[in-house]
Amino acid sequence: MSDLAREITPVNIEEELKSSYLDYAMSVIVGRALPDVRDGLKPVHRRVLYAMNVLGNDWNKAYKKSARVVGDVIGKYHPHGDTAVYDTIVRMAQPFSLRYMLVDGQGNFGSVDGDSAAAMRYTEIRMSKIAHELMADLEKETVDFVDNYDGTEKIPDVMPTKIPNLLVNGSFGIAVGMATNIPPHNLTEVINGRLAYVEDEEISIEGLMEHIPGPDFPTAAIINGRRGIEEAYRTGRGKVYICARAEVEADAKTGRETIIVHEIPYQVNKARLIEKIAELVKEKRVEGISALRDESDKDGMRIVIEVKRDAVGRVVLNNLYSQTQLQVSFGINMVALHHGQPKIMNLKEIIAAFVRHRREVVTRRTILALRKARDRADILEALSIALANIDPIIELIRRAPTPAEAKAGLIARSWDLGNVSAMLEAGDDAARPEWLEPEFGVRDGQYYLTEQQAQAILDLRLQKLTGLEHEKLLDEYKELLEQIAELLHILGSADRLMEVIREELELVREQFGDARRTDITANSVDINIEDLITQEDVVVTLSHEGYVKYQPVNDYEAQRRGGKGKSAPRIKEEDFIDRLLVANTHDTILCFSSRGRLYWMKVYQVPEASRGARGRPIVNLLPLEANERYTAILPVREYEEGVNVFMATASGTVKKTPADEFSRPRSAGIIAVNLNEGDELIGVDLTSGQDEVMLFSAAGKVVRFKEDDVRAMGRTATGVRGIKLAGEDKVVSLIVPRGEGRILTATENGYRKRTAVAEYPTKSRATQGVISIKVTERNGSVVGAVQVDDCDQIMMITDAGTLVRIRVSEVSIVGRNTQGVILIRTAEDENVVALQRVAEPVDDEELDAIDGSAAEGDEDIAPEADTDDDIAEDEE
């Protein structure tokens, strides 16, 4: 115990944590998670391929059990679990994981549905043909070898690859404090980019992108936009969006549309994708899908999504793109080990690092070839000398009592050059090995043999003494001199060295190059999508139930006076058109919600539908939250100076904000007005700065004031008081009066009246205002007020779901301070909850039909005769 105590050294825990964690982090970064920029391999990939190479598990030989390879890897090179090694092998054998597979697998290696591979005892593997190019010239001293984990084996520090594997197959890894995510690319394009760099090392990133336009994924699909690619290639970091390749097919007979998905984004699990679509349909977050099935087979992928009759296939597909992994983002983070250190590298730096690596590999290979050629030439010189001096050499050997004395005799004297003097003198300098001392070789017209040369002469077989063999020796020597001259040219000329690299890259491209799979398309990030949209005037309709659509304005043809006109959309009987806007397809629709938020929508983003179609729910087009509803929609073409957005809340707060404050759209919406708890936005309108504003309260009060009484405020301001409310009173309507129309006011018990705008006096802001309609027990509270003309129609809705539509001309015109007359008789527990001016035009026959179906009898909707009490005005 005392001996153990003497071996324990107290340390500061903070210092130990720093030191140990740093060691661990560097071990993970360098030895596990990040690829080398030169060969694009992590250590485990490199060790697997090297083990297969040592085993002779070549592409043109028999498969070997995966377990055999795994055993060799973990036993010799990779002292970790077998699962990590086998998972690496599986990934290198999956056609949907690697753009160019490095392992040729036989058996079950998983699927794009996320199925696991079979156990390693069942599957068999061998190297793919292209994997051999990663280890080409490995035996030619092209790379350094290092000890394995226990010093009993040697493994390559890096592969002498001819394949630019880092870009071709990409890499993914999470280290400590950093990660890498490099997408795969097309081999032909990557080699073209490297060839362009070899020709001009000053080439720009833009120049390289002419050859390498972007990633090329094994699962194909489509990349939306080039900006993310450009950013990643320029800085080493960026984001690209990959969407599935899908098409919308229409049945020629029924007209029903079907979405067919042929390709999905990289690394997306197809089974989970289908489950997610089904879940969204079940939760009604995506509408318009009637059936979903997977018809994929060995010939390819095919996901079939059947669209309902009243749905638009392209709209459904766009919703799926936005809510599922039919479209995903791929974050590019090109981190690799460069000179043993992690570094974020751009496209040019990665290409330059590979070319430098190939330059070193070719140089080292050439040096070895030169050394071997000179050694062989040295032996051929000795054999040529022996043939030129055959008789004296044979005599010397015959007289020598032992081989050692014969060798010593050969070395001790000089030899005539004979008939090979010209050949030997021509190749003396080029073919002379670097290790050869000056006293050996050709000197003073004589030849002096080395010990190695003397041994080669003693080993010479008698058949080599024939004349034919003599000629072969001379021919081989001449070929070696030519080879040595070429090798020296490669080592002495940078241009020739790069030419060799270029020739080898071209050979790889010719042998393994293929066509691009992934298309790259421009999107709204790169171009202005409005340039692709035809400008035309359209009619946008939004129903009370929240269905929106547009139709070309030409669908509403001009009619002679007295004509029947075209019927409006026949939607559901309990629904009606709430808002009708005439706008241009390039206009922006500002959508304000009850929670004071603003959302943007371009008119061309609204689905186009026929007259008889309902359109699409606006909640599918805007990211509205639960219990959030739209309050107002306003069309805006240009954010002109002097135009304001005027807002009013239920608590009587008003706010005026310049329209250009809302000129920068955000996909998630923005806060248009800050609301106090329990408050909500009830009305929004555009003003010119010279308008007047009217606020109507549930207690029958109205205040009319000039717009300039409210100063312009910033987007996030709360606003100021517009009307002074008493007790539980609240604002129900905001009106910016325009023209000489009348104000129609309605109460919850079905009473209504029309009053000229001129009868409402202009007062100061923040006052109680004047009476707009007398609120009594008979009338009930005010539910709303609208400005109308004689030709308009209105719709009243009750909490029991009853809708009554009536012509405005049938509502009596009375004074401001009156109770009004009955418009709709409600049941005992039934109240009117909303009043809305109907936006769409209809003919008289249709109006009568709607009125007849909505009311139990004519007497229920016929206005009562005005009584003296009804129209008698009280003093204010």
UniProtKB/Swiss-Prot annotation:
Transmembrane segments: none annotated. It comes from the Bacteria. It is found in: Cytoplasm. The keyword Hydrolase does not apply. It is an enzyme of class 5 (isomerase). Its main location: cytoplasm. Its EC number is 5.6.2.2. A motif (GyrA-box) lies at residues 559-565. One of its GO terms (cellular component) is DNA topoisomerase type II (double strand cut, ATP-hydrolyzing) complex. GO terms for molecular function: ATP binding; DNA binding; DNA negative supercoiling activity. Residues 844-876 are annotated as: Disordered. Belongs to the type II topoisomerase GyrA/ParC subunit family. A type II topoisomerase that negatively supercoils closed circular double-stranded (ds) DNA in an ATP-dependent manner to modulate DNA topology and maintain chromosomes in an underwound state. Negative supercoiling favors strand separation, and DNA replication, transcription, recombination and repair, all of which involve strand separation. Also able to catalyze the interconversion of other topological isomers of dsDNA rings, including catenanes and knotted rings. Type II topoisomerases break and join 2 DNA strands simultaneously in an ATP-dependent manner. This is DNA gyrase subunit A. It comes from Klebsiella oxytoca.
